[in-house]
Amino acid sequence: MKRLEKISSIVPILLRITLNLALIMVGFTLVAFLIREAFTIFNNIFFLDTDVSYYYMTQDILTFFLYFEFIALIVKYFESHFHFPLRYFIYIGITAIIRFIIVDHSSATSTLILSGAILLLVAALFLANTKLLKREG
């Protein structure tokens, strides 16, 4: 019985270490992509070719912010003692939907539905920032 208790106390620790190492690797990968995206943006700004559309540059900037938000989420995970704050997921969702609307705005109906989804996420963000749901220190 004591051996089972010891094993059940070690397993969560090993899983947390594995999760943390995986998140660190994902974080470094995202930093590499963030640097690459920043290089692409600055290259387009200073050496803008006439063939490069500002539309694609806007896509690159929004992708940059998605990388940035995921990195901030991982940093916040470690700062808040292994807890993912809900509001960071909502920020990422809002940014991703905005990027999608900018990239694919061919249908007015889908744009309206996606705008409604953003409105719902903003309402969820408002609720997440109330004292009832706030867990961050």
From Swiss-Prot:
UniProt keyword terms in alphabetical order: Cell membrane, Membrane, Transmembrane, Transmembrane helix
A GO BP annotation: cellular response to phosphate starvation
Keyword Nucleotide-binding recorded: no
GO cellular component: plasma membrane
Bilayer-spanning residue ranges: 13-33, 55-75, 82-102, 108-128
Record-linked Pfam families: PsiE
Subcellular location: Cell membrane
Protein's UniProt name: Protein PsiE homolog
